[in-house]
């Protein structure tokens, strides 16, 4: 049994390959370098219409606040959260890495913007209702519920 020495040699660990992010076939670096006109062409119809009609004062103010928060953040740190009520704001590549407090009608839910969120609305990441947890039927829900004994 001692004669069965098998020389395996240095074992190299497998290199992990990560999926490179792309939005509609365009990688993230190219998205960040695009002009707004080129970027709008990649969005879905509703978002294209929204951007073609122009960004009004409030969405532009949010983007300016996000730029300021990123600029003032120390390198390697996350920027300060920026609170907003603009649930209908469409996420653009410039916002990636920012933290936004999106108002849901009661509280501000902090959302960290990731590349996968491009083209979506802020509201999609801050749910404004409490999902229903269906339980037992109440009294008077159906005719047969009259015969359900009360606890």
Swiss-Prot record:
This protein's gene is called RPS15
Task: Give the HAMAP family listed for this entry.
Answer: Ribosomal_uS19
Q: Which Pfam families match?
A: Ribosomal_S19
> Which PANTHER family did the record assign?
RIBOSOMAL PROTEIN S19P FAMILY MEMBER, SMALL RIBOSOMAL SUBUNIT PROTEIN US19U-RELATED
UniProt entry keywords in alphabetical sequence: Ribonucleoprotein, Ribosomal protein
The protein in question is named Small ribosomal subunit protein uS19
- UniProt entry tagged with the keyword Ribonucleoprotein: yes
Database matches in InterPro entries: Ribosomal_uS19, Ribosomal_uS19_CS, Ribosomal_uS19_euk/arc, Ribosomal_uS19_SF
